[in-house]
Amino acid sequence: MILPRRITGFNVPKGHAEGDPRSFRADCWRVVAPLHGRVEDRPQVLDVRFTSFMTQVLVLPDREVTALLNKVHAWLGFCRPLVPGGCLLKFVDLDPVGSSFAALGRYRVLSRGELERPVTESMCAELGRGELHQLKYWRKLAERGMIRVGDVVFNFWD
């Protein structure tokens, strides 16, 4: 896996189109409605000005999850519901929801295994200098000096 330039949300040029929250929400409904699920509005746990992603809460008959969409690249993942004060995303696999998002042809759906994989130097070949600087800084603060792919794609570093 190669992390594309600007996936971190740092150094994105002004005027660069971000993902559209309305389209994302509509796609969430399109995917969960056939499964007797719904999309719920919840107070934001994280300040969206400082995140590289947008969220939607998906309520399914057997569980609740948060869908995460990177603001720059249409990379999608899922985690347990976000809690105030929480600083670690707990990624999950979510089929058939993930497959349904992939079938829309607009998203790259990342599995839990991909999201939890440690970031390696070779994955960072396309990242910009500012992004690499941020990774170096946050890696020092991370538990055991390890940053996961999901921490880069869906970050709330300020």
Feature map (PLM): residue ranges:
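Extended, charge-biased low-complexity segments
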Residues: 1-118
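Acidic, proline/glycine-rich low-complexity IDRs
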Residues: 110-158
